[in-house]
Structures are given as C-alpha cells and as structure tokens.
A protein has these predicted regions:
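Asp-based phosphoryl-transfer active-site loop
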Residues: 5-28
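Glycine-rich phosphate-binding loop signature in dinucleotide/nucleotide-binding domains
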Residues: 6-7, 139-140, 194-197
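Conserved phosphoryl-transfer catalytic core
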Residues: 26-93
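Metal-dependent phosphoesterase signature
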Residues: 65-127
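Substrate-recognition element of Asp-dependent hydrolases with the DxDx(T/V) motif
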Residues: 109-110, 118-161, 173
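Short, conserved catalytic or adaptor-binding loops enriched in Gly and charged residues
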Residues: 163-171
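Conserved nucleotide-cofactor-binding alpha/beta core module
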Residues: 175-182
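Conserved Lys-Pro-Asp/Glu-containing loop-to-beta segment of HAD-superfamily phosphomonoesterases
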Residues: 182-204
C-alpha cells in the first residue's frame, strides 16, 4: 500500500479471514476443530451458564431449522429437554453454513481457546502482517480488528502466531456485537467507539 494513502489515516481496521489470515485456516482448520470437539465440549460444559444461555438463544432463533432426526428436540420448549446429540447436530449444521450468529461464535471461541491453550492450535497470519503492524504502530497509527469471529477468537489468533504474540500492536477488537460487517451503521458505531472521524479510518 502506498504510504501516501496512509498519510491521512489515524486508524487501520483489519478483517481477519482473507486479510490477515488465509481463508483455509478459518474454514479447514478452525471450523473443523470446532466440529471435531463440539460434542465433548457441550458434554463438559452443559451446565455452564454462558453455554446454556448461548444454546437457548440459538434454539430460539433456529428452532425451525431442519437438519436430521438427531436435531429434532432442539425445538423443545426447554433446554433441559435438549440432548447433547441434538445440540451438536444443529451447531454442526450452523458451522457448515458459516452462520455468523454471535452465540455460535462464542461457543466456537471457547472450543478454540482450549485448543490454543494445550497447543493443538496455533494462530496463522500472512508473513507481511507483523511487518505491517510494526510499521503502522511506529508511525503512530492505531490498529483494530473487526471480524465476524468473537473477540475472544480474534485475540487467540493474534496471541499465538508463528511470529509471536502480535496483540501488543492491536488497540481494540470488534465482532458482530457492534453490528454485522454488511451493515453501514456498524462502521459508524466503531468510529464512535474509538472516537475517530470516519474519514481518518481505513478498513482493509
């Protein structure tokens, strides 16, 4: 990118998928890891208030989704009646269709956190990412991340790359809690949150 373009920019906001990180890493590594470990995670964390709340909200949103017979009781009126097999079936389907539901992203992030913690996962970024981040930071520019993945998932990727922990370069993180990337008002909310004029922000 020409330096002249960045002269009038105070903040660089980066997407993850296809921008800092290969798309294949998200779809073939992270999504696959989530699916492979989903049943065990739900079994271990079924009584977790955070997980139960996320599942209940997903049930309310997707109770009419037709997957297969194993997901039939996901449409029950109470989470107490929903089996681990049913919840796993529905969530696997949502992962397959790349659902951006924040509740799904929360659960994915928690599964990935276990993988990063025990070394089964390692963040992947393009080789020019740490170089660019270091340059922008030295030039006094702020760096933020805006991705459909949860803030937790974002931090996990950048804290465990083969180039080391890159989170010291990043000022803030935003996920679908601020709004969808396809909605113009989401970017206005980010500008307000970081207290910068939109014309001083570059989204890549």
């Amino acid at each position: 990118m020409e330096l002249k373009v960045l002269d009038s920019i105070d903040v660089v906001i980066l997407d993850i998928e296809g921008t800092t990180t290969p798309i294949d890493f998200v779809h073939k590594t992270l999504f696959l890891f989530a699916k492979q470990n989903l049943h065990n995670f739900l079994n271990k964390n079924r009584n977790s208030e955070i997980v139960r709340k996320a599942l209940d909200e997903l049930r309310s949103i997707y109770m009419n989704v037709e997957v297969d017979s194993t997901g039939s009781d996901f449409r029950s009126t109470s989470m107490d009646d929903v089996s681990i097999e049913s919840a796993t079936s529905i969530l696997n389907h949502l992962i397959d269709v790349d659902s951006k539901a924040s509740q799904l992203k929360l659960i994915e992030g928690m599964i990935w956190e276990e993988g990063y913690r025990d070394g089964r996962l390692k963040g992947e970024v393009y080789s020019d990412v740490p170089v660019s981040m270091k340059k922008w930071k030295s030039d006094g520019k702020e760096i933020c991340i805006y991705s459909s993945g949860s803030v937790l998932a974002q931090k996990l990727i950048f804290s465990s790359t083969e180039y080391g922990d890159l989170t010291s370069y990043i000022t803030d993180y935003f996920d679908t809690g601020i709004g969808k990337k396809t909605e113009p008002e989401s970017y206005g909310k980010i500008a307000a949150a970081i207290k910068k004029s939109p014309e001083r922000i570059l989204f890549i």
